[in-house]
Structures are given as structure tokens and as C-alpha cells.
Amino acid sequence: MSSITLFGAGSWGTAMSVHLASAGRDVVLWARRPEVADEIRRTSHNPTYLPELLIPSSVYITTDLEKAAEASDLWGMAVPSQQLRGRAEHLRPHAHSGVRLVALSKGIENETLLTMSQVLDDVFESVPSDQIGALYGPSHAEEVAEGRPTAVVAAAPDEGEARHIQKVFMTERLRVYMNTDVLGVEIGGSAKNVLAIAAGIADGVSYGDNAKAALVTRGLAEIRRLGQALGADPQTFAGLAGIGDLVVTCMSPHSRNRYLGEQISTGKSLDEVLNDMAMVAEGVRTTRSVYNLAKHHGVEMPITEAVHAILFDDKSPRKMVKRLMTRSAKHENWLPTTLQQ
């Protein structure tokens, strides 16, 4: 029987604990807040995230970081992206060369512009780089928790490590594919949250299906451009962590980032919307990171630039859409000269 420790009792950590426990895995779920851990122990429900979900008694809940770390050599990191480094630094003394790390949260660190697996690699010097991977794809926590059919991708630099992640997480309800392009998987799975905000804005101002289709298609093109500039395999963006994750995040009522964009379109300020949301919308901070990555590498990402201007420069959504629609004419498969070489 495989064992795993999940760090983070948010919606994804909670959903994954139920999924893995249902598959017969030994699961330890680490919660930062004692009151959350106490409530889960008492009621078998997380009071804040997915409160309707019944958490099996076989899931061991703890707030003791050392105890959680020592319970398994496979650690699933489900804390919010901008908190990952801090949590990892607290865990570092308990890591060793036999530990495997799986990034479950999606995002790009604001200060360093590193992906989640890169942050883990930066912090955990005692863990070999090829033992650090990610599990990404079109997978809303609500549906995974309910056991609805879902497909994701396990990415690790070494195929054997990717296969190990696949073996632990895969069940008849969660199909897991493998990929060794960790960078491409993480860029696709993170940058799509920026496009989801744009999709929500489009929904909020009732631009219709044509606009949404254009947004998803051209959004994928700019994510792929960024990925190629960073050295990712362009084929990855045609997979689950690329177009798959982009479609579900832009279309689903479960998407926090799409919802945030919809609320922004009503004239609310970003602070107002965030204060009203109980759960983290990773796309806000990821917008800063993707915008800065694109600038640093000279990659044109007009939709990302528009979302950045709306969120942080108080630009009108309608005016930014007009700017996008009146850009100079281009070939559909246009690429910067640097990416054609």
C-alpha cells in the first residue's frame, strides 16, 4: 500500500486526500490552522473548503509538520503558490535524498519567476532534482472529490519518477498520463489561470461564444509562445496541462479565476472581489508573474497584457478588448523571429 503526505488542507489538498484514501492509500493531511484540523477530526468535514465533502476517518489529520514529514517519503505540496517557498523552508530540515516531491498547486512565484517544482528544487538541496515532479491537468477539486472521471498528467524529469507518481495517484476515476516536460506542464497549468480571468471578464460583459472561442484559441497560442521561449516542448500545450486545463478553467462554473474575472467586469475593484472570495484565486498573482516572464524573454502576450492592465492599472475591460481587436493584422501561425530559428 502506497503512502503519501499532503501539505495543505485547502480545497485541492482536501479533495486529493479523499481521492487517495478511497483508493486505499495511507494518507496524512497536514493543516496549518489547528481549528481546521480539530473540526475535520470532530466532524469529518473541512469547515472552509468543500464543506459538503465527507473525509474518511482513515485520513490522518495533523498540524505537526515534523510528524507529517516523517509519515511518508512522498510529499504532495498543495499549499498556495506564493506560500510554497515559506512552507518548504520549514520542511527542509526533515527532507532527505529518499524523499519524492510532487507540486500540486499551480502558479509561478512572483519574486523569482520560478515554477512550483523549480521552487522546490531551489529549497530542497538534499532531494535530487529528478525526484521533483508535478501533477497538473483539468481537474477541479469539486469533481475529483466527487469521483467524477478526470484525466491529469504526472510530470517529472525522469520517466521512472513520473511513472511512480502515476502509479500512486491513478485510479479508475482519475486517469494519469506521464510527461517528462515538467516545465511545459507547469507553464501551461499556471498561465491558463490568467486566461481564465479574461474568460470571466468576457462572460461578464456578455461577449458571447465567438469571443470565448477566440480567447481560448489565441490564449493557448501565447502560452505556447512563452513555453517555447523558456525551452518547453510545444507539443505539451496540446495536452492535458495545456489546452485541457485551459478549456476547463475558462468554461467551468467551478473556476475561481473565471469567477473573479466575471466580478471584475461588473466594476468591482480587485480588492473588493478578493475580500468576498473564501478561496484563493491563483490567477491574480500568476498574472504578475506571467506578464514579467513575457517581458523578460521578449514574448508577445497581448491577452495577458490586457488582463494585467485591467487588474493592476484599473483599465476598462471594454477598452482593452477594443485594443486587442484593433491590433495590427497577423498570420494565424505567427511567431517571433527568435522562436522560428
Curated annotation (Swiss-Prot):
Family indicated by similarity: Belongs to the NAD-dependent glycerol-3-phosphate dehydrogenase family.
Enzyme Commission numbers on file: 1.1.1.94
Residues annotated as signal peptide: none
Residues spanning the membrane: none
GO cellular component: a single term: cytosol
Subcellular location: Cytoplasm
Catalytic residues of the enzyme: 192
GO MF entries: glycerol-3-phosphate dehydrogenase [NAD(P)+] activity; NAD binding
Protein encoded by which gene: gpsA1
Residue numbers binding sn-glycerol 3-phosphate: 106, 137, 139, 192, 245, 255-257
Reaction it catalyzes: sn-glycerol 3-phosphate + NAD(+) = dihydroxyacetone phosphate + NADH + H(+); sn-glycerol 3-phosphate + NADP(+) = dihydroxyacetone phosphate + NADPH + H(+)
SUPFAM superfamilies for this protein: 6-phosphogluconate dehydrogenase C-terminal domain-like, NAD(P)-binding Rossmann-fold domains
Protein name: Glycerol-3-phosphate dehydrogenase [NAD(P)+] 1
Function: Catalyzes the reduction of the glycolytic intermediate dihydroxyacetone phosphate (DHAP) to sn-glycerol 3-phosphate (G3P), the key precursor for phospholipid synthesis.
GO biological process, one term: phospholipid biosynthetic process
Pfam families, sorted: NAD_Gly3P_dh_C, NAD_Gly3P_dh_N
